Amino acid sequence: MANQQIGGSTVTYNGAIPMGGPVAINSVIEIAGTEVLVDLKLDYATGKISGVQTLYIDLRDFLGDVTVTMPDTGQRITARAGTQGYYPVLSTNLMKFIVSATIDGKFPMNFINFPIALGVWPSGIKGDKGDPGAPGPAGGTVVVEDSGASFGESLLDTTSEPGKILVKRISGGSGITVTDYGDQVEIEASGGGGGGGGVTDALSLMYSTSTGGPASIAANALTDFDLSGALTVNSVGTGLTKSAAGIQLAAGKSGLYQITMTVKNNTVTTGNYLLRVKYGSSDFVVACPASSLTAGGTISLLIYCNVLGVPSLDVLKFSLCNDGAALSNYIINITAAKIN
C-alpha cells in the first residue's frame, strides 16, 4: 500500500468573529457563457473586509445551479436552482472565488466575514408546475426544509395500492412536499425539523394588486407598504409577523437580519425604480434601471436590528416606486430572515 503524502498546514479564516465587526460585500454575479472570477484582494488589502467565512447565494429567480470554487483550499460549493441560503466557506487571504453556473444570467451573492451556520431554504415564490416566476406558491404552501434531506428506496412503500405510492417521513422530519411538473410529479420527504439550518425566524411575503397592494403605486413617491393583506408564502418561527406597518419584530429578537426585496413589472420599462427598506431611523435605498426589472430586480441587505420592545419602532418597512411613471402591474416579493 502506497503512503499518502499530507501537505503543510494552511491558515484559514473560519470559526472566528472578526475584530472589526460583521461586514458583508454585496454583489450581483452575471454569468455569460463562461465562469467568473471574483477577486476581493483589493477589498482585503484596503481593510474593507477582513476575510470571507460565509457566502449568501440567492437563486430564487435563477433557473440554473451555481458552483463556487475556492482555488486556495479547493473547496467547492454547489447551490441548487430556486434556493437561497448561507454556505460556510473555507478560504485564506487569497480572496479569490471562481463562480460558474449551468445557465447564463444574474443572481445576488454576498461575501460575509463572519461564520454563519449552513442554512438553505427553497424559493418563497415557487409556483404551479415548478415555475419560480408564477405568482403564488405550489399547493398553497412552501415547505422550509433542511437542504441535506433526501430519501431512497427504504422510504418507499411499493406494496401500496395500484397507481399509488406511499412515502414515509424521515425520522424527525417535518413534512412531505409534492410538486406537479405536468409530465412528472416530484415527492420529497423533508427532515431536520424544518428550521432552515441556522435560520431561526424568517418570513416571506408576496405583495401585488391582488394580495394587499394598491391598484397603482404613484410615480416618484416612496410610501411605506401596508403589508397586512400581503400573501404569506413562507414562515419560520414566531419572531416575524406581517402588519400594516411592515414586518414586525418580536421582543427579544435583536440580531442580524438578511433582507431581500425583489420586484417584477412588465409594463413600465423606462426610468429607474427606487427600492427602500427602513428600520428605526435608518433608510436603505437602491436605484435599479427599469429595464432590468422586467426579469426581476433585487435589493439584498444585511441589517442589525436592535429590538427595543416597542412595536411602533421594532418594524421593518418597505416601499418602492418608479421615478417617472405610476405602477399598475407589479409583483413584489419580500423576505426577512434572522441569521444570528
From Swiss-Prot:
This is Spike protein P5. Residues 2-122 are annotated as: Domain-1. It comes from the Viruses. Its main location: virion. One of its GO terms (cellular component) is icosahedral viral capsid, spike. The short collagen-like region is proposed to act as a trimerization signal leading to the fulfillment of the symmetry requirement of the minor capsomer. Keywords: Capsid protein, Virion. It is found in: Virion. InterPro entries: Phage_PRD1_P5_C (IPR015044), Phage_PRD1_P5_spike_N (IPR015043), PRD1_P5_C_sf (IPR038663). Residues 142-340 are annotated as: Domain-2. Homotrimer. In association with P31 and P2, forms the spike complexes located at the 5-fold vertices of the capsid. Essential for viral infectivity. Residues 123-141 form the Collagen-like domain. The lineage of its organism: Viruses, Varidnaviria, Bamfordvirae, Preplasmiviricota, Tectiliviricetes.
